[in-house]
C-alpha cells in the first residue's frame, strides 16, 4: 500500500512516498533555513508563502524519485497540527484537494505523533511496546507506546520544550538559527563540567526547562556585567549536559519502572549527538534496547507522516475534509 505524505508545519516543505508504512520510496524536503536564518527564527508569513510556491513541485519530485504514477497512490496523509497555522493550511489544503480529485482516502496526522513513526522506518522490524521520548522545538513528551496508534503520555514539559530552550539559549549566545545544531556543534569544544546549572525538580515524568533557560541567561549576563572572561563553548556544553541529563534520567526511570526494555527517541532534538550518546550508554548499562531514527528522519519530514498515515489507514481511520489546521495541539493519551 502506497501513502503520499505531506508535511508543512513549520519551515520545511516536504513530500514522501512510503510503502506499507516502513519502506521509503522517496523523501523530498525543501528547507527554508537559509531564508529564516537572517531573521534569527522562522517568520510565519514568509514560511507560508514559500510553502505555496514549493508544495506542488515537492510532491511532483516525490513521485518522480519513487518512479510512481499518481494513479498508484492509495492514500494521502498530511500534518494538521501543531505548527504555524498558515504553513499547516498549505499542506492540508493540498492533501485534501488531491484526495478529492483522485478519490483516495485522506488522513490528518498530529505532527508529534508522526515523529514517533520515524523509528518504524529506520527499524522495519520494530514493534510496540516501547518507551518513546519525543523531543522537538515545541514539545517534549515521554510516552508508553502500547501498540500502533495506542499510547499513554506519562510525561510532558510544564513550560518550554527542550528544543525551544536550545533555540533561545543559542540566540542569546549569538550562535544563530536553528539553535539545536548550533549548540551541539560548539559544545563539542567546551567543558560540560565548567558550570552547574540547576534543573527544576518536577514531579513524576514531567519536565521543566524555563528555569534552566533563565539561569543560563542570568549567569551569562552577570559574567558580562563583571567583565569576566568565559567561553561560549563552556556555557553551551554545560547547558546541553543539564538538558540531556534530565531527559535521559526520566526516560531510563520509566523504562525500568514499566519493565519495558525498549527505548526510542524521536523529534528534532533526537539528532543531538550528546543525547544519542548518553541515552545509548545508559540503555546499554541497563540491558535496554535503544532505537534512534536516521538523522534525516529526526528533523521534519513527510516520510514519518506517510508512515503514521499508513498505520491509521489499515485500521480504517480516515479523516473528513472538514478537518482544519490546529496550530496549538498537544499529544494526549490514545486508547482504542
Swiss-Prot record:
Enzyme class: transferase
Chief site of localization: cytoplasm
Binding sites annotated in the UniProt record for substrate: 134-138, 167, 180, 184, 272
Gene3D superfamilies in UniProt: 3.30.420.40
Catalytic activity, EC: 2.3.1.234
Subcellular location: Cytoplasm
Biological process, per Gene Ontology: tRNA threonylcarbamoyladenosine modification
GO MF annotation: an example: N(6)-L-threonylcarbamoyladenine synthase activity
Keywords: Acyltransferase, Cytoplasm, Iron, Metal-binding, Transferase, tRNA processing
Function of the protein: Required for the formation of a threonylcarbamoyl group on adenosine at position 37 (t(6)A37) in tRNAs that read codons beginning with adenine. Is involved in the transfer of the threonylcarbamoyl moiety of threonylcarbamoyl-AMP (TC-AMP) to the N6 group of A37, together with TsaE and TsaB. TsaD likely plays a direct catalytic role in this reaction.
Family statement drawn from the similarity comment of this UniProt entry: Belongs to the KAE1 / TsaD family.
Protein name (record): tRNA N6-adenosine threonylcarbamoyltransferase
Organism: Caldicellulosiruptor saccharolyticus (strain ATCC 43494 / DSM 8903 / Tp8T 6331)
Gene: tsaD
